[in-house]
A protein has these predicted regions:
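Residue-level signal for inorganic ion chemistry
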Residues: 20, 75, 169, 266, ...
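Small-residue-enriched segments and motifs
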Residues: 264-266, 321-322
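C-terminal accessory subdomain/extension
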Residues: 271-401
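Hydrophobic "anchor" residues on beta-strands that sit immediately upstream
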Residues: 37, 128-130, 168, 322
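Fold-independent oxyanion-binding glycine-rich loops
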Residues: 40-42, 68-69, 89, 108-110, ...
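A charged N-terminal "starter" segment
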Residues: 1-104, 110, 118, 126, ...
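Active-site loop/helix belt of alpha/beta enzymes
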Residues: 8, 42-59, 77, 114-119, ...
Length: 401
């Protein structure tokens, strides 16, 4: 539900559209003339796909990429008219929906191509496809590393099927965000195989109209990598960097702004005396008089339980406040002894503040990546969109349901 009226200040994610624009422009400056396919899968990495896609469209994105048909249809219902690519699997029975909504889908095996073509013919149309080349990710795609010639033959067979229209070729780098010598060589080999596949298709009379291989790390590290490919047919496909985070600890650029700030409010303040405990398992016992604030959020909202017992840091009135005891499903406690002015209903920044954690520091503390932290913000958390400091939209999935 898109709204601009006040929302319940319980827990919410503020999405900075200015930062989103800045990040897109930073990628565009690096990519030069290469068109950009903005990746908005997983609800734009937790930021809200429709609102983010609208910004990318305004900024000149050429394509949008999602993971599944449902995400693509959501964008169409949200008024997005840009070409959309589904990067993953779509069951052949939904061929009619692909055709009706003008959605392109990944084609990654002979069996999938045949089933999709048959369903498209039965629906009275043709599905547009981008051939997915597996050059070393080992996920989905025509297996070029296993048997290059056989993979090309399968691609050409797919191109000839009556229910399919091949309009592109793509692949995905698996270690472009790792600058170790071995992985640099592996990425270069992936690129070499991809270029070889393009030219094999071209030689057989099936030259793809569009080719794309660069993810976030690829486009920033190797903007020259249309090398070996016709630049006028190439496109880059950035993801995490659009939302303000570098691809990895090894590959850092320093030019992106985090887009999401996760906030909640203080529900209660109390003084704990030595010997008193907080939260499940009695993992925190006060050793001295301690002022404790209870916050209206927990792991059901996407705040990781692994940040229990002092690992997490929340910001209140510009002061870093450590988490006390275990994070609960819907509530958590923090030490506000050093925040004398704290009051009930005051805002607390869970991540994205000046002295609080960031999605990146949380990822390090919980042995994961910022992608997972951002995507983990649950649907019950409203997304509040700000532009030049003003709230311009609110997305609240619970109210919509």
């Amino acid at each position: 539900m898109m709204q601009t009226q006040p929302f319940e200040k319980h827990v919410w994610a503020e999405i900075d559209l200015e930062a989103l624009r800045h990040n897109f422009r930073a990628v565009k400056a690096r990519a030069g003339a290469l068109p950009l396919c903005a990746v908005v899968k997983a609800d734009s990495y937790g930021h809200g796909a429709v609102q983010c896609a609208r910004v990318f469209a305004e900024e000149g994105a050429a394509w949008l990429a999602v993971s599944c048909l449902t995400e693509a249809v959501q964008l169409r219902k949200g008024g997005l008219t840009l070409p959309i690519l589904v990067l993953g699997h779509v069951q052949p029975g939904y061929a009619a929906a692909l055709i009706q909504n003008h959605i392109t889908v990944a084609c990654y095996s002979a069996a999938q191509a045949k089933a999709l073509s048959d369903a498209a013919v039965a629906a009275g149309g043709r599905v547009q496809i981008h051939l997915k080349a597996d050059t070393g990710m080992g996920r989905i795609g025509f297996a070029l590393r296993t048997d290059f010639d056989a993979a090309i033959r399968e691609m050409l067979t797919a191109c000839a099927l009556p229910g399919l229209e091949m309009t592109g070729l793509f692949q995905h780098f698996s270690v472009a965000d790792d600058v170790s010598e071995d992985n640099i060589a592996y990425t270069a080999e992936q690129h070499r195989l991809f270029v070889q596949a393009f030219h094999a298709l071209k030689a057989a009379g099936r030259e793809p109209a569009l080719v794309h291989c660069d993810n976030s790390a690829g486009v920033m590290l190797h903007p020259d990598w249309p090398e070996g490919l016709p630049r006028e047919r190439c496109m880059a496909r950035p993801g995490i960097i659009l939302y303000g985070y570098d691809p990895s600890d090894e590959v850092r650029f320093g030019c992106f702004r985090p887009v999401m700030t996760l906030k909640t409010v203080v529900s209660m303040i109390k003084e704990m005396q030595p010997g008193q405990c907080a939260s499940y398992g009695r993992r925190f016992t006060a050793e001295k008089p301690t002022k404790v604030a209870t916050l209206c959020t927990g792991y059901a909202d996407g705040y990781p339980r692994q940040l229990s017992c002092g690992k997490g840091v929340v910001e209140i009135h510009g002061v870093a406040c450590p988490v006390l005891g275990r994070v609960c499903m819907d509530q958590m406690m923090v030490d506000v002894t050093d925040v004398p002015e704290v009051r009930e209903d005051d805002e607390a920044i869970l991540w994205g503040g000046t002295v609080s954690d960031t999605a990146e520091t949380i990822a390090r503390k919980t042995d994961t990546i910022p992608y997972e932290v951002l995507c983990g913000v649950s649907r019950r958390v409203p997304r509040v969109y700000r532009d030049h400091g003003q709230i311009v939209a609110v997305e609240d999935w619970i109210l919509e349901a």
